[in-house]
């Protein structure tokens, strides 16, 4: 299992090359150096650069490169695109998708960026405080999910409902999602 968690620990004083050599010693026989350097090259990370001089997003990608080099069967990635700007995030999402398919890897990931999920996942689980709200193939969610926007009168309190997920109100506008079809709500 390869695990990437938010706030991952790295040796800040090392360079990209030094940290790869350090981690490789812990995985004799299974370390895939080429997977690490392929990702570093794809993201244009300079291998002589010290980790302490990298952005948060670059550090995340170094951590992910180290995980890919471990060659795990299962990758667990928590907020894997944290700190990446949209261009690099898109590049990385495409790389991760292609890597998982070509290497036959299973990837369990979390993200708050729905656009990334549409391009990466086959099945989706939507959770709220540890409770599974929905578990379906992504194609079905995209087909059946509905987005609604309502104008809320000033001072009106909304009642709680199990039919709406993650409501948010900004400037008297309620934006919510439902996976019930209009015919099911009548």
Please place each PLM-identified region on the residue numbering:
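ABC ATPase nucleotide-binding domain "signature" loop
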Residues: 82-84
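Conserved catalytic motifs of ABC-family nucleotide-binding domains
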Residues: 71
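ABC transporter nucleotide-binding domain
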Residues: 91-179
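Conserved structural locus in ABC ATPase nucleotide-binding domains
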Residues: 50-52, 80, 137
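Catalytic Walker B motif of ABC-type/P-loop ATPase nucleotide-binding domains
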Residues: 75-79
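ABC-family P-loop ATPase nucleotide-binding domains
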Residues: 3-62
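Helix N-cap at the start of a conserved alpha-helix in ABC-type nucleotide-binding domains
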Residues: 86-88
